[in-house]
A protein has these predicted regions:
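Low-complexity, Ser/Thr/Pro/Gly-enriched N-terminal "stalk/linker" regions
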Residues: 1-76, 101-120
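C-terminal beta-rich recognition modules with glycine/proline-rich loops and embedded aromatic residues
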Residues: 13, 19, 211, 291, ...
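Hydrophobic core segments within long, regular secondary-structure runs in both alpha-
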Residues: 18, 25, 29, 37, ...
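Well-ordered alpha-helical scaffold segments within catalytic/enzyme domains
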Residues: 21, 81-94, 142-157, 192-203, ...
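Carbohydrate-binding/catalytic loop surfaces
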Residues: 50-70, 118-136, 186-198, 228-264, ...
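A conserved hydrophobic secondary-structure block that centers on an alpha-helix together
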Residues: 124-201
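Active-site neighborhood of glycoside hydrolase catalytic domains
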Residues: 188-190, 195-223, 233-309, 313-320, ...
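Beta-strand-rich binding/interaction modules
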Residues: 479-499
């Protein structure tokens, strides 16, 4: 943990202008945020009701009625506000800001005199903090805090920040080691990382100390949850909790003893993100080491090639090493967001490019697969193989949706996707003292202050269609000396770097190319990475992928879809000895780099109705078209497959 922690570049100082990402970023500003505002106000016909804003109106006395929705329904508006804040940080939008301010006014009026804020417990009158296992009070508080911090940093308005500070002050009087306080912790981690954010913006150490208390206390014996009424009397809000062991919420042992990622995937990576934050703030090398162990277990043994996590639908959880089924997995969009958050924090502490590789994998694949290109339909679950006729009839796959949905009763994923896209700049760059880091190759312009002075960078690329990346440097004054660190992706076997057309020898350290020199206005760094198509194979311990290949280009995973290749994709066999052909399809989804593959398929015209027989099926040679996994299901319902049989 040598040196200071890297910091992200202020979103106000980043302008993204990228041929690939613009369509998604523009969706957030022009479609997703207005649409989700209508959704949380229950104004979209045909979508599941949110009841979120309605609950706040009831809680503050504007309306009469019962609480509806989940115990954590308040987080719908919290995550929407956070996404709105990131959007406003880039560009002021009076209409969006007015909507956000109206929601904040409502939240402020729903807050209790002592600072408590939660519509479910306020409206129902149920006892506060009586069901930490599943009541989600602290989880909901965490998302409120994250939203308030983001809104303050984006707009300078402090009303929402004051609301959550009052709430956090109250929580500090309720929870802690002291006698008379509750010695418990959240059933769903989230407030821990939020309290660290609140500490960083307010410098109030009691918020950091409370976050540390929650993390350090988790898993102690006797387990706090076992003494709660819901467990003792089997009186659960969520009936399935009766089947879950303590590893479901990572409370089965102290965190510094946990070496495998267990339980609910979102809970896990939110918790690990907080652990990474606290490891830095307290310079706790032991806690950081535990983060590394857990991260390695996820990435090396429990993560899908698309950057998604959570193999089982029941419990939305991790299972065991190398258990990665393709058609029944859960792979929740929120879990992918959490993995990106955890990985980005680990990069900021260690400056190791392996963590950013996973951020990139998660963002380019599962995150984008979670949203349709109309910005109004979403996936909660992200399988790697779908046969609609089976998924819709077999209850084993009841969690798998064969088309994206308008909204969900548990709608954590749509606003989570929105807030991640809106804050993309946080993942693209980082800086420390006199070094600026380029992590993702997203066309953009940034301004930042280093110890040597002000610096402006203009990044141009058509990544990952092409591997060329150009950085134009504008220092505060000619002769200004500083370092540029550019990530060399692990999938690029080579990287050619030049400055003003002249090749440069650079230092490669932990996946980053470092170039230190005295810069002048107009200097251009050009890096060429290898993003050609490649076939990737899986560790044979993953039974589902034996004898199969996956096609990738740069960080992007590709798949076969019924719209291009017909039915029975699981029987198609790819000839990996034939290099894939680049096929840019202007008409597909606004222009998409596809791949032409050669192989063979079963001749189903010669297949009869006999269920079992001795004769082998007949194969015929054919060509196939693969598209980016993130683009699947934008042309109607149909089969999809990522892992293809290999000749």
């Amino acid at each position: 943990m040598d040196g200071g922690k890297l910091t992200t570049v202020d979103l106000k100082s980043i302008i993204i202008n990228d041929p690939f990402w613009n369509r998604y970023i523009d969706l957030v500003d022009h479609v997703i945020l207005p649409f989700q505002w209508e959704l949380i106000n229950d104004q979209v016909e045909g979508a599941e009701k949110s009841y979120c804003i309605r609950n706040f109106r009831i809680a503050c006395g504007d309306e009469k009625g019962d609480h509806k929705g989940m115990v954590f329904q308040d987080t719908d508006v919290a995550k929407w506000l956070e996404a709105a804040a990131y959007s406003l940080a880039k560009k002021r939008n009076p209409k969006l800001e007015a909507a956000a301010d109206s929601a904040i006014d409502l939240i402020a009026r729903a807050q209790c005199e002592d600072g408590y804020l939660n519509t479910y417990y306020t409206i129902t009158g149920e006892k506060r903090w009586s069901d930490l296992l599943e009541g989600h009070e602290l989880y909901t508080a965490g998302h409120m805090i994250e939203a308030a911090v983001a809104y303050y940093e984006a707009t300078g308005k402090n009303k929402f920040l004051h609301v959550v500070c009052k709430f956090a002050d109250y929580m500090c009087t309720v929870f802690g080691k002291e006698e008379g306080k509750i010695h418990g912790y959240p059933g769903h981690p989230e407030v821990e990382l939020a309290l660290v954010k609140l500490y960083r913006v307010t410098k109030m150490t009691k918020y950091l100390e409370l976050a540390d208390f929650f993390v350090q206390t988790r898993g102690e014996r006797p387990c706090y949850f076992l003494n709660e009424d819901c467990v003792k009397n089997q009186n659960f809000i969520f009936p399935e909790f009766k089947d879950f062991d303590l590893d479901y919420n990572q409370s089965h042992m102290p965190l510094k003893e946990q070496e495998t990622a267990e339980g609910h995937a979102v809970r896990a990576v939110y918790l690990y993100s907080a652990m990474a934050d606290l490891a830095y703030e307290y310079q706790d090398k032991e806690l950081l080491k535990q983060c590394e162990i857990l991260w390695n277990n996820i990435v090396e043994k429990r993560m899908y090639i698309t950057g998604s996590i959570g193999s089982a639908s029941y419990g939305e959880r991790f299972t065991t090493d190398y258990d990665l089924p393709n058609n029944s997995n859960y792979s929740e969009s929120c879990a992918t967001v959490g993995l990106a958050m955890f990985s980005n924090r680990m990069f900021q502490i260690t400056r190791d490019g392996k963590y950013t590789d996973i951020v990139e994998k998660a963002l380019y694949n599962t995150l984008l697969a979670g949203i349709a290109l109309d910005g109004k339909h979403f996936f909660y679950v992200n399988p790697l193989e779908v046969v609609p006729e089976i998924a819709e009839k077999n209850p084993t796959y009841r969690h798998v949706k064969t088309t994206r949905q308008l909204w969900f009763g548990v709608a954590c994923c749509p606003p989570n996707i929105a807030r991640t896209l809106a804050s993309l700049g946080n993942y693209v760059y980082a800086s420390e003292q006199n070094t600026v880091y380029v992590n993702l190759f997203v066309g953009s312009r940034i301004e930042t202050d280093l110890s040597s002075g002000h610096v402006e960078l203009l990044l141009s690329s058509d990544y990952p269609v092409k591997g060329d990346v150009t950085l134009e440097i504008t220092p505060e004054m000619d002769g200004q000396e500083f370092t540029v660190g550019i990530r060399k992706p692990s999938y690029s076997g080579k990287a050619e770097l030049s400055v003003n057309g002249i090749k440069e020898a650079v230092c490669l350290e932990k996946g980053y190319l470092y170039l230190t020199r005295k810069w002048k206005a107009g200097d251009k760094i050009t890096v060429v990475f290898d993003v050609s198509f490649r076939f990737v194979r899986c560790n044979p311990r993953v039974r589902d992928n034996i004898g199969k290949v996956c096609l990738m280009k740069g960080p992007m995973v590709y798949c076969l879809e019924e719209a291009d290749n017909g039915k029975y994709l699981a029987s198609d066999i790819m000839d990996s000895s034939v290099p894939p052909k680049e096929e840019f399809d202007e008409s597909l989804l606004g222009g998409t780099m596809c791949a032409g593959l050669e192989g063979m398929r079963i001749d189903y015209s010669r297949v009869g109705d006999t269920l079992y027989e001795e004769e082998r099926p007949s194969y015929i040679k054919d060509t196939f078209k693969a598209i980016p996994y993130c683009c699947w299901n934008n042309r109607g319902k149909g089969e999809m497959i990522v892992w293809m049989r290999e000749k």
